[in-house]
From Swiss-Prot:
Annotated InterPro entries: Ig_E-set, Rho_GDI, RhoGDI_dom_sf
One term under GO cellular component: membrane
Ranges annotated as spanning the membrane: none
SUPFAM superfamilies referenced in this protein's UniProt entry, alphabetically: E set domains
Superkingdom as given in the UniProt entry: Eukaryota
Example GO molecular function: Rho GDP-dissociation inhibitor activity
Identification of the protein by name: Putative rho GDP-dissociation inhibitor 1
Family listed: Belongs to the Rho GDI family.
Function: Regulates the GDP/GTP exchange reaction of the Rho proteins by inhibiting the dissociation of GDP from them, and the subsequent binding of GTP to them. Regulates the Rac-dependent signaling pathways controlling cytokinesis, actin reorganization and the contractile vacuole. Required for efficient accumulation of cap at the cell cortex.
Biological processes, Gene Ontology terms: actin cytoskeleton organization; cell morphogenesis; mitotic cytokinesis; pinocytosis; regulation of Rho protein signal transduction; response to bacterium; Rho protein signal transduction
Amino acid sequence: MSDNHEEESNVPAYVPGKHVSVDQLKQQDAEDEALKRYKESLLGTGVHAPKDDPRKLVIKEMKIQIEGRPDTIYPLDTKELIKEMKTKPFVLKESCHYKITLTFNIQHDIVSGLKQTNTVYRKGIKVSTEKHMLGSFAPQALAHSVTNPRHGWEEAPSGMLARGSYTAKVVFTDDDNEEHLSVEYAFSIKSDWKSDD
């Protein structure tokens, strides 16, 4: 929950390139052996995904890291676990330092310009919206991980007005404005780790 709420006026206009599939990339310049090896190092040798799962983005887990505390890990492999996340809030002590790590797989095709939009609500009123560019990712067997903030820690708000229960919704979209996943979660900001305020 940083203070850069919805500020995009200083961001230059970004125009995404035309979408090119993994198969199209592999077929371009197929006769060039050096380029073929380079592409395989970037894209892998095959598409890693179950044939019965059409999703391009599969979030595996969301990890809340709080400085000096054990991590809180939410597995998000299934729709049931994603729905359950909203009913299991995590606690932030006011002024604590935290960061959030997402672990995910990309399957079937390249996801270009993956973005995360996190909107936080308190008592139904929007408090903040933050957008993070995560990057472009090719399908691979190993999971990708992205941590926000990438450097340092985020500081939780403090003071009597900041304390309370919050809900949030994080939406993952790409350059083609395809919505890959929407997850709702809840958290509380308290004066100490065990208080009921």
